[in-house]
Structure formats: C-alpha cells, structure tokens
Amino acid sequence: MLGVGMAAAVLLGAVALLLADAAARRAHWWYREAAEAVLVGAVALVVVDAAARRAHGWYREAALGAARRARLPPGEMGWPLVGGMWAFLRAFKSGKPDAFIASFVRRFGRTGVYRSFMFSSPTVLVTTAEGCKQVLMDDDAFVTGWPKATVALVGPRSFVAMPYDEHRRIRKLTAAPINGFDALTGYLPFIDRTVTSSLRAWADHGGSVEFLTELRRMTFKIIVQIFLGGADQATTRALERSYTELNYGMRAMAINLPGFAYRGALRARRRLVAVLQGVLDERRAARAKGVSGGGVDMMDRLIEAQDERGRHLDDDEIIDVLVMYLNAGHESSGHITMWATVFLQENPDMFARAKAEQEAIMRSIPSSQRGLTLRDFRKMEYLSQVIDETLRLVNISFVSFRQATRDVFVNGYLIPKGWKVQLWYRSVHMDPQVYPDPTKFDPSRWEGHSPRAGTFLAFGLGARLCPGNDLAKLEISVFLHHFLLGYKLARTNPRCRVRYLPHPRPVDNCLAKITRVGS
C-alpha cells in the first residue's frame, strides 16, 4: 500500500509540474505578447506624436514659403490646438517657472528667440534684453498682441487692446491724475492713514493672518478710494472678490466651460462692469442735475477729461480703463509689498540697513512738518533698491504680448507679419549675464547702477510703460516705511510652497503673525 501511495504522489507531482510548466510557458508567451504590444504602442505613439507635430508645423508655416520658413527662429509648433501651452502650464504649476524657456534653450541653443504655438496663435518667444528692447521700442513694426481671451477679460477699450494712437490719447488724459506730483501728493495722506490703521489692526488681532490677503484688501481699498472716491465695505469686498476671480482666468487656457477658471473670470468681468456702470450712471445723473463731483476722484477726472480736439471718453472707455487700473492696484502692489516684507524679514542685515535709512529720514523732518512728504519718500534710496530688486526677482508681470505688423528680424531671425510675439521679462530678469546670481535677493546690485534699456522690465518699456508705476511704488514705500519702524513678521510656514499663476504667492497666502516692536 505504501508503494501505491508513493507512486500516486509521484504521479500527482509530475502532473503538477506539467501544469506549472504549461502555465509558466503561457504566462511567458502572454508577457512577451504584452511587451511587444506595449512596444508597438509606444512606437506608434512616438510616430503619431512626431507626425502630428510635423503636420501642425507645416499647416501653420506652409503659407510663408520656403525662403521665409528658412529664416524662422528655432522651435516647434507642438500639437494642434495645444502647442506649447501644456509645457508652459506644467512648468509654472510645478513650481519651476523657468523650466519652460529652459527647455527651448536645451533643445535649440541660446538663440534668444524661439517659435511656438501659444494661446491659439503662432508665436515667437523673445527672451533677451536686446530683443525685448527692440520689440518694445518699435511701435511701427509691433502693436499690442494680447490673446483675445485676455482682451475679453480686461476689455477691448483698455490699454492692452488699444492701437497706438488711441493708447497715446487715453494715456495722456490719465497719466497726470495717476502719476503726477500733485496727484501723488494728494493721495499720500489717505495711503498713510490706511497703512497705519491696517498694521495696527493686524497686530491687535494677536493671532496669525493671511498677510497677502490682508495686503491685497488694503491696497484695493486705497485704489478704490483713488478711482471711485471710496465705497462701503461690502461693495469693496465684492469688487475685490471679483478681481481675484478675474485674475485666476487671466493666464488660464481659454476654456469657456463650467468648472474652468476662464469661465469664472468672464462672470467676474460682467459683475465688475455692472458695478462700475452703475457708479458711472449715478455720476452722470448727478452732473445732469448740476451736482458735480468736482474732480475729486479718478472717475470724475475721466468724465471731465477731453483731448485737444475736445473729445470726451465714452462709458466703455472709462469702464475698461477703470477695470484695468483697479486690477493693477489690486494685484501688483499687494504682492510686491508682501514679498519685499518677507525678503527684508529673512535678511536681518538688509532689514537693519533699511530701518536705519527710515530713522535717519524721520530725524531730518522739521518739527513743524506733519508726516512725510512725497519728497521725503524720494530720498529713500535703499528702500527704492529693495523695491526694484523685489520687482526683478518676483516677476509679477513675467510676459507681455505684441503682434508683428510686417516681417521683422530680431536676433537675425524672422518674425513673420501677423505672428504674435511674447516678451519674456522673467527670462531677462533671471539671466545671469545681466544679473549675476539672479536667484539671490540682493538690493545692493542697484547701488550706482542705472540699468540698460531692456534689462529691467518690471513696468514695461517705451510708449506702453505702465502708467501707474509711481503710484504703485509709493504705496509699497509707505507700507515698508511704517513696517520697518514699528513691526515684525513671523511666518507660520516659512518654507511654504510657492504657486506661480496667476502671480507668485505662497500657497498659504503668507500666513503670519504681525507684532509691534519697540522704537
């Protein structure tokens, strides 16, 4: 019986081995077939990818002819419809904003100009100071070329969409009331009161606040006062929320479907226009009854303004100008103020030097003078260097848009008539050949340094230089003056990740505690 059992066991073992062998062979065959299928699929994807890119490039460039195509900058159009947008968004959303242009440099060399397909248009990316200067200073060869989706948000009668002659007309009417010496002198007391009361409130709060959120509210309150003569807190908050939503859609893909940032931005634009139209209607009705605002705020000045031909601005022009300026006042000043404060707090030697300058200026003020004057702020040389370095390093406006009106050569490469041009200010500001050790915050690099045209583009260049630059710098200077003399900032998450779209900011909005310090 034992022998029979042993034989049965051997037989069962043999059968098991045969089954295992068959299963192993089948599995190997399946694995080999699957691997081959994956390999074939991968090859097919590569072929399809290359074919789609080549076909898209041919479609966009065929009309140029062989001679003009040969003079194009290096680069590629990428996939149809998408082009370089996925790479652009991936770089910025992954926290590596310089990786987008770096990929062109790595693949095509350091030529300073590259071709791509961005925001639904064939586009040339200009990344050098010399190239940006050439484009920005040539108003005959280049006109404003912002994407249609952006124009729909900011407004067709705003500076980003106006032709040169109309831009010059509107700028002339609005420049003095915004950046003029008398205008800034008039704005200073309100800016000062708003800053000091805000700092006191944050310190009295005792706990942590979202520093960036509070700064944006503060700067928006200032800009609403300047442009609309103020508004109640509920209206100001509603406007501020709408501008926040508007900005999230500015550099998003223009997908007008539920759940996408661009659709929300369009809704925000409609709300803003409705509010501003309501205020404008009230002003015009009051004037019709003989009750004039007397030019006490920017809206009154825009209503009253007329050019040398006696032409007044219409409602659409006034509203789009206000949308543009209010947005700039809401975003730029608040972000730069936050980063300048953070950079100073992180660098005690720089903080001490900036504070010493403010203390020296305070000692020089006559006892008969109440508060600081505009001339006092223009003596703050080191603080100005801090602000310029923050503007360079943070890159609030990292890119600008133009369109070629004729065939133009930049850096020896052709930009065809009708093509879009992106001016990458960020690449200029982060170029080690222009700014050694560019990722370092170093205000001293500005001592005795007058930047060459095209190397510092925080406010643009040429005829379309940002018309509110002096107002923005005044707001930032007033805040830093009071902060340096009486407060300190302790961040809750000092190593917090930075989000770069639509503007660089910590993901926690710089959660921090603000406390008073002794004099």
Swiss-Prot record:
Keywords on record: Heme, Iron, Membrane, Metal-binding, Monooxygenase, Oxidoreductase, Transmembrane, Transmembrane helix
UniProt keyword RNA-binding present: no
GO biological process: gibberellin biosynthetic process; pollen tube development
Protein localization: Membrane
Molecular-function GO terms, alphabetical: ent-kaurenoic acid monooxygenase activity; heme binding; iron ion binding
Cofactor: heme
InterPro entries in the record: Cyt_P450, Cyt_P450_B, Cyt_P450_CS, Cyt_P450_sf
Chief site of localization: membrane
Membrane topology: Single-pass membrane protein
Official protein name in the record: Cytochrome P450 88A1
Gene that specifies this protein: CYP88A1
Keyword Transcription regulation in record: no
Top-rank EC class of the record's enzyme: oxidoreductase
Residues spanning the membrane: 1-21
